[in-house]
């Protein structure tokens, strides 16, 4: 089975868990097509991330003329589906903190993705995260593309349920992944009981390479290391207090 993975920026320094997830699926025999909405804003240092760059299609690498031409092509070929996707993009745009124009831009990207998927014969799209990648995947499905799913990490999605149209994304998705039982409990609150079975938990983990490292000797003085982005979602100041 061929599946498309859609991320806002991929590969990226903070997205190694997505790279490992893709590698694990490929080890099980799946074929994964990587799609990134745009290029990473930061330089890559990990050799595996650098290698992923050559395997990834960046949807916004196309010039403006090509993007507009592809959008018009989708409109002409299936105006009813395009109208449905346009309505969804407009609805998301009026709610969104990013505004209508940004969400209409997601529709343009979805048209580009729709064309790429048709040529690659992908049967499903999985997006990380529940924000704009899930919006593009949803619009692509409304345009006639394959069904989609997405992974919700939180807490950003839970803090902006209305603004990112999270309920509608859950309703239209074939399934939704939470990375913890708590995350699943928050998603269950946003959908009908009949949809609860499609909310599943897939936890983030480390790979065998990490587990094969010899344990270091125990130092005389505690030496604590925290690796993570310095943003409010990570709660770094709470870790220091703890």
For each feature predicted by the language model, list its residue ranges.
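Conserved donor-binding/catalytic core segment of Leloir-type glycosyltransferases
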Residues: 206, 212-234, 240
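N-terminal subdomain of nucleotide-sugar transferases
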Residues: 1-65, 146, 171, 204
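Short hydrophobic "strand-cap" motifs at the C-terminus of beta-strands
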Residues: 6, 153, 179, 202, ...
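An aromatic- and histidine-rich active-site surface loop
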Residues: 99-115, 122-143
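A conserved catalytic-core segment of Leloir-type glycosyltransferases
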Residues: 34-103
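Carbohydrate-associated surface elements
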Residues: 182, 205
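A conserved, positively charged/aromatic
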Residues: 98, 148-174
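A structural motif in glycosyltransferase catalytic domains
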Residues: 18, 25, 224, 239-240
């Amino acid at each position: 089975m061929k599946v498309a993975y859609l991320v806002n920026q991929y590969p990226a320094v903070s997205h190694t868990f997505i790279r490992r997830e893709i590698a694990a699926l490929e080890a099980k025999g799946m074929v994964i097509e990587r799609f990134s909405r745009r290029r990473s804003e930061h330089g890559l240092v990990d050799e595996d991330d650098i290698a992923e760059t050559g395997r990834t299609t960046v949807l916004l690498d196309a010039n403006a003329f090509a993007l507009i031409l592809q959008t018009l092509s989708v409109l002409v070929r299936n105006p009813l589906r395009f109208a449905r996707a346009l309505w969804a993009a407009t609805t998301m745009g009026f709610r969104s903190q990013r505004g209508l124009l940004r969400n209409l831009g997601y529709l343009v990207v979805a048209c580009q993705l729709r064309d790429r998927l048709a040529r690659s014969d992908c049967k499903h799209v999985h997006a990380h995260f529940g924000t704009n990648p899930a919006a593009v995947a949803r619009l692509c499905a409304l345009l006639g593309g394959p069904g989609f799913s997405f992974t919700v990490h939180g807490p950003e999605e839970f803090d902006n349920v209305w603004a990112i149209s999270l309920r509608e994304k859950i309703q239209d998705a074939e399934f939704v992944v939470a990375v913890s039982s708590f995350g699943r409990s928050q998603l269950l609150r946003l959908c009908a009981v009949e949809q609860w079975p499609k909310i599943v938990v897939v936890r983030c983990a480390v790979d065998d390479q990490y587990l094969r490292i010899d344990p270091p000797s125990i130092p005389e003085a505690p030496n604590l290391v925290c690796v993570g982005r310095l943003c409010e979602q990570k709660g770094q100041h709470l870790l220091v207090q703890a």
